[in-house]
Amino acid sequence: MNIRPKCGCGGGADLMFCCSGVADTAEIGDRAVRLLHKEGGARMYCLAGIPANAELIMNGARAAERILVIDGCDTDCARLTMEAGGFTGFLHLRVTDLGMEKTKSPVTEERVERVARHAREMLAVAQGVGQ
């Protein structure tokens, strides 16, 4: 992300924003983000706070070390929301790019874990882990 922390604290947490739309692929993405949040590797943040210009959300996003944005489909609502809020340079994962078809991919634990695994890998690469 191009916006960097202004404090001397060394940066913020890794944050995740997800479109939690009505399609099955959006629910899969949402559940994957919630799973990762529970694991503690990155924190789920409120996407609606970006267009609302909610101070707490905006400040947290600006201070983030890395941001991962997950969309369920190629409409890319979460990506577009973040860009409209002035954020660029974030990681982006689209559930349908993993072979799941919108409205034809029932939510299963296997699908949720598949998205979570890709998200973990993206964050690890961005952190330089294993390089």
What spans do the regions from the language model cover?
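Iron-sulfur-associated redox domains of electron-transfer enzymes in respiratory
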Residues: 1-131
